[in-house]
Amino acid sequence: MANYYLGVDMGGTLIKIAIVDDKAAVIEEAVVNTDINANPKSVIENITEVFKKFKNYNKVKTIGIGIAGDIDFRQGIVRLSPNLPKWNKVQLKRDIEKITGKTVYVDNDANTAAIGAYWLDIKAKADNMICVTLGTGVGGGIIINKKLFRGNSGTAGEIGHITVEPNGRKCNCGNYGCAETYIGVRHIVKETVDLLKTNKSKYILKLANNDIEQITPKLLSQAAEKGDVVAKKVWNNAGEKLGILLSDIIDFFNPDYIVLCGGISNAGDLIIKPAKEQIKKRAFKTAAKACKIVVSKYTSHLGVVGAAMLVKN
C-alpha cells in the first residue's frame, strides 16, 4: 500500500495543495487564491478546510509546507515572508499540527522546489544537483547525496545574493550587484523600459498595446523570437549575469546537474545560450564539462511535490 503525503506551496498569488504518493506522483490537487492581506489564522483555517475535501486525506501521513521567506525549519516558524506581509513569527508547524493532528514540516520555497526537482527531474539520473529558481527573485536549493543541504541556520542556497557585478545595482538585502538585481522579473522588465527610452523596438510596445505595464518576460520572449533587438539585448544581458552566477555554482559545488525553474527559465535558449557562453569562459573546465544544465519539465509542480516530500529530508 502506497504512503501518501500532503504538500502545500504557499505563493504570493496562489496556494497549491496536493496529495503525493511515495514515488512523488500527484494523486489529488487543488489551487486556492492567496489573500496577502488576510491574517495567518484565517489562511491556516482556509487551507486546512481544503485538506479535508481530498478523498485520500485520511491516508495522509505527514504535511509539508513551502513558503518564501526567513523560515526556522527546525521549529516550523515563519519568521518573515515577503509574499505575506502579515506573517511575522508565525508558528505554522504548531498551528497546523493542532488542527490536523498530523506531523508538519515547514521550509523555504526554494528548498522545496529543489526537492521537487530532484524527485521529478533528476532522481533516476544523479545524486547531486542545484536547483536555481528564476522568478520575481532568484533562489536556490542544494541537493547533496540525495538530501537537501540547509546549512547551519537553514539559509544555504541564497544564490540570488551572490555578487555578479561589483558595485552594481543596490539590492533589497543591502548588498550591491546581487544576481537577483539582474535576473529577477522586476529588474528584467525595468531594464526593458529603460532601454525603450533610447532604443527603437519593433515588437515590444506593439505586443504590449503601447502599455509598459503589460511588459512581461513572456512578452519579451515573444518579441525576441520575432527578432526584436531590444528584447534580444535584455535576454542576452540577463543570460550573461546568469552565466556568471552559474559559473560560481559549478566551481563551488561541482554538481551533476543544475536545474533551472520558474518563469524566467521559460525563456529557454534566449537566456541559456549567453549563460553557457559565460560558463565556457569562466567556470573550471573539468567541472563545467561534468555539469548538465536543464530546464525543469515540472516547474508548476516542483514546490508542492517538494513540500510533500520534506518528510524524506
What is each of the regions a protein language model found here?
Residues 1-62, 72-77, 93-102, 116-126, ...:
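ATP-binding/phosphotransfer module of carbohydrate and carboxylate kinases, centering on a glycine-rich
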Residues 9, 64-68, 131-137, 141-143:
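Short beta-strand segments
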Residues 78-89:
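A charged helix-plus-loop insertion that forms the helical arch/lid used to bind
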Residues 104-108:
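General beta-strand structural signal in soluble alpha/beta enzymes
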Residues 113:
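Proteins enriched for Cys/Gly/acidic motifs involved in redox and nucleic-acid/cofactor modification
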Residues 143-144, 148-149:
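Catalytic-core segment of enzymes that process non-peptidic bonds
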